[in-house]
Amino acid sequence: KLRGVDDLNNKVEHWLDWFGIQDKRDTMCKDLSKGQRQKVMLASAFIHEPRLLFLDEPFANLDPIYQRKCRQWLLDLVESGGTIFMCSHVLEMAERMCNRMAIINNGKVLASGTVEGLKLNDKENLEDVFIRLVGHSIEEVERQSDENNDEEE
């Protein structure tokens, strides 16, 4: 029995079906792909129907279909009064999902606030904000990227 989960078998079946991994029911985690392991991790968090969730890189290794499904489930949770604390390096996704955030580099909080409050203007995105806050210029980062691409050719 899973603490706090009534009707466990039905809930397990629901989340296995929701994540499309019913056929993996009896498979050991070590034998699952990274994406399947991520689905198991998320299902184990979602099964409790929590009002508060802490997630670390929740969309890592998920295909776009399940990224979208999970993103919508999480947004619905927030809309119904839930709270999510999430760590992510995918700033584009964080910008679409979060109403408040902290930008951290090397363990130090560089800035926190609303997504719009962190931007200098409407043209700036969170990737631009991060680059600015860590003391680089966008032009410098793009130049370094171009140099790395030239070396690979």
Show which residues each predicted segment covers.
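Conserved ABC ATPase "signature" region
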Residues: 1, 6-24
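ABC ATPase "signature
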Residues: 112-113
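Catalytic Walker B motif of ABC-type/P-loop ATPase nucleotide-binding domains
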Residues: 53-56
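Conserved ABC ATPase signature
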Residues: 28-32
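A short, surface-exposed alpha-helical micro-motif characterized by mixed small hydrophobic
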Residues: 94-96
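Conserved catalytic motifs of ABC-family nucleotide-binding domains
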Residues: 49
